[in-house]
Amino acid sequence: MIRTVIILLLFIKSSFIFSQSYQIGLLKYSGGGDWYANLETSLPNLIKFCNTNFKTSINPEQAIVEVGSVDIFNYPFIHMTGHGNVVFTNQEADNLRKYLLAGGFLHVSDNYGMDKFIRTEL
């Protein structure tokens, strides 16, 4: 009986955790690398694909979050895209480092020519 109750409680708890919705943050950064590239398609398409194929519950409304803001810690997943140059101040780099070390996930989509710039910043 106790075993059944424990299994039932674990099932209820896990179904609650996995049914929660969360929002993905779109990373706003400096350097002229147009962080807003494909604003209307890139992240919305990724969210739609995940919700449809993986049965996730990602909020389709994307939130814009600045790399140096404490708000970055409100998002378990942040998406970064653009073309070309990426520049982080020391404070922004430190904030992003803390976010990643705390378990945050950064998805970098090299939309075109961003690779060599982002590697020096990371």
Segments predicted by a language model, with ranges:
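Short, functional N-terminal and low-complexity linear motifs
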Residues: I12, F16-I17, A63-I64, T89-Q91
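Charge-rich, low-complexity amphipathic helices
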Residues: G68-I72, L100, I118, L122
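Aromatic-Pro/Gly-enriched surface loop or interdomain linker
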Residues: F18-F77, T81-G84
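Short alpha-beta junction capping motif
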Residues: I24, F77-I118
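Sec-dependent N-terminal signal peptides
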Residues: T4-S14
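Extracytoplasmic/secreted proteins, especially bacterial periplasmic and envelope-associated proteins
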Residues: T41-N45, F49, Q91, N95, ...
